Amino acid sequence: MNDIPAIGSPIRTRTILNEYDLHASKRLGQNFLIDLNVLQEIVQGAAIGPDDTVIEIGPGIGSLTEQLAKAAKQVVAYEIDKKLIPILSETLRPYKNVEIVNRDILKADFSIFAKNQSLKIVANLPYYITTPILFYLLNSSLNFKSVTVMMQKEVAARLQAGVGSKDYGELSLAIQYRVNVEIILPVTRKSFMPSPNVDSAIVQLTPKENFQSFPHEEALFKIIKASFAHRRKSLVNNLLYYFGKNDENRTKIERSISETGFDLNIRGERLTLENYEQLVNNLSENMIFSKE
């Protein structure tokens, strides 16, 4: 194993692609990571250790899988592209702690991980499906310690964005509701083969300690979505679009916003998650809608 270049090295990646006449699938958003420093940064950033079971999403030809296998107790790699399975079986043959599963992660049975005490998720996701996969994982039964993901740089900025910034919005609040977000490392497009049209970033999500769901979660996210429907409009006007424009609704909305402690000209981007939770409570108490 030591005499063979790492799978993620440019020379080994080219050799594998040529040997199997393999071309990156645009339909599946495939780009192969060929920067060993970045691969090792992912493993180190995820703090993978000998007690960890790792779920990897989208192993490709096994570049990241190989580095994970060297550090983890077990790696279960989910690959949706059937033609990559025999390649993965060959490139990862030396690593007996790797299991390759040909399945869409959105259809995976996570019950097999119920007894894992130290579960971590690592992924180099196609950009077009990053957000759906993240929400699927966050809403799943998986008791993970962290999710470490390579994603488009702009999406990473939106996930981490703080109140009042240009990137802050519905996605920021929806993700930060359940987890803490940290950008570990920016990654240039030159680290991939073929090079994508955008730069990337490695992001880590960790569950909030003592997380308790808001009792009226569905109402909360409906209000958040409505509040960012027209970013340049005030919160009052956005909520009027949502509830319906009439004098009674305006009075109740304005009262609810005032009771939250804000000026009536405030925009949705100025409210924190805690502010939105209080706003939902106030809107309900003012009987503009039911939280149930």
Swiss-Prot record:
Localization terms from the record: Cytoplasm
Single Gene Ontology MF annotation: RNA binding
A GO CC term assigned to this protein in UniProt: cytosol
Signal sequence, start to end: none
CDD domains documented for this protein: AdoMet_MTases
UniProt-listed InterPro entries: KsgA/Erm (IPR001737), rRNA_Ade_diMease-like_C (IPR023165), rRNA_Ade_Mease_Trfase_CS (IPR020596), rRNA_Ade_methylase_Trfase_N (IPR020598), rRNA_adenine_dimethylase (IPR011530), SAM-dependent_MTases_sf (IPR029063)
EC top class, as a word: transferase
Domain of life per record: Bacteria
Keyword list, A-Z: Cytoplasm, Methyltransferase, RNA-binding, rRNA processing, S-adenosyl-L-methionine, Transferase
PROSITE patterns, per database record: RRNA_A_DIMETH, SAM_RNA_A_N6_MT
Catalytic activity: adenosine(1518)/adenosine(1519) in 16S rRNA + 4 S-adenosyl-L-methionine = N(6)-dimethyladenosine(1518)/N(6)-dimethyladenosine(1519) in 16S rRNA + 4 S-adenosyl-L-homocysteine + 4 H(+)
Residues involved in S-adenosyl-L-methionine binding: 31, 33, 58, 79, 104, 124
EC code: 2.1.1.182
HAMAP family: 16SrRNA_methyltr_A
Family designation: Belongs to the class I-like SAM-binding methyltransferase superfamily. rRNA adenine N(6)-methyltransferase family. RsmA subfamily.
Function recorded in the entry: Specifically dimethylates two adjacent adenosines (A1518 and A1519) in the loop of a conserved hairpin near the 3'-end of 16S rRNA in the 30S particle. May play a critical role in biogenesis of 30S subunits.
Name of the protein: Ribosomal RNA small subunit methyltransferase A
The organism of origin for this protein: Oenococcus oeni (strain ATCC BAA-331 / PSU-1)
